[in-house]
């Protein structure tokens, strides 16, 4: 869906298809992940005895994964929504959403917005539509940005299932990746 929106709306967000690799040191765990992937309909996922970044460990190969710049995508998506007559309300705290023939959104300031559709995008649900909200814990993520010689690492996505997990992606720069 994201790829179709990028193409239709001509959003410049560095969208590209790349290979993905789930890295692992435990072959049994990777085999279980492979079975789960296949049961979920991801039949193109393959087991590889050698990962591209560590020939001593195996990996699962996920073809045709998507990679894009999320902020550029969201900026382009917002422009497309506004161009088509949509409205985006930022820094607006919502306390209630009622769905009937139309959607009525009520803000903390008491303002009501009536519309055909509303997107509620939050990190945690604030509406009482779910009987149980699972435990939410605070987590930290650390990001490293490194310059590497262009072409020195195959443009792919790499991740593992360790705790904490590791995730690597290569992004193009002017003189380095």
Identify the function of each model-found stretch.
Residues 1, 8-16, 94-96, 102, ...:
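Active-site substrate-recognition segment that forms the wall
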Residues 1-76:
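Flavin (FAD/FMN) cofactor-binding and adjacent substrate-gating region
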Residues 5, 37, 80-81, 171, ...:
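Hydrophobic helix-cap positions at the C-terminus of alpha-helices
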Residues 15, 54, 80, 86-88, ...:
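A generic structural signal for short, solvent-exposed coil/turn residues
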Residues 26, 50, 64-65, 91-92, ...:
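Fold-independent oxyanion-binding glycine-rich loops
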Residues 36-37, 59-117:
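Helical element adjacent to the flavin cofactor pocket in flavoenzyme catalytic cores
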Residues 45-49, 88-90, 120, 159:
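General beta-strand structural signal in soluble alpha/beta enzymes
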């Amino acid at each position: 869906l994201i790829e179709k929106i990028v193409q239709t709306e001509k959003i410049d967000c560095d969208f590209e298809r790349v290979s993905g690799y789930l890295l692992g040191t435990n072959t049994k765990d990777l085999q279980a992940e492979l079975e789960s992937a296949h049961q979920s309909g991801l039949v193109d996922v393959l087991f590889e005895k050698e990962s591209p970044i560590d020939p001593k460990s195996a990996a699962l190969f996920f073809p045709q994964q998507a990679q894009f710049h999320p902020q550029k995508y969201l900026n382009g998506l917002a422009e497309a929504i506004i161009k088509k007559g949509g409205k985006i309300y930022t820094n607006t705290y919502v306390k209630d959403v009622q769905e009937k023939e139309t959607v009525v959104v009520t803000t903390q300031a008491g303002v009501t917005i009536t519309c055909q559709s509303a997107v509620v995008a939050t990190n945690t649900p604030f509406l009482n539509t779910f009987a149980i909200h699972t435990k939410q814990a605070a987590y930290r993520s650390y990001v490293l940005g490194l310059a590497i010689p262009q072409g020195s690492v195959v443009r792919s996505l790499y991740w593992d299932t360790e705790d904490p997990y590791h995730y690597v992606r290569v992004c193009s720069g002017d003189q380095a990746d």
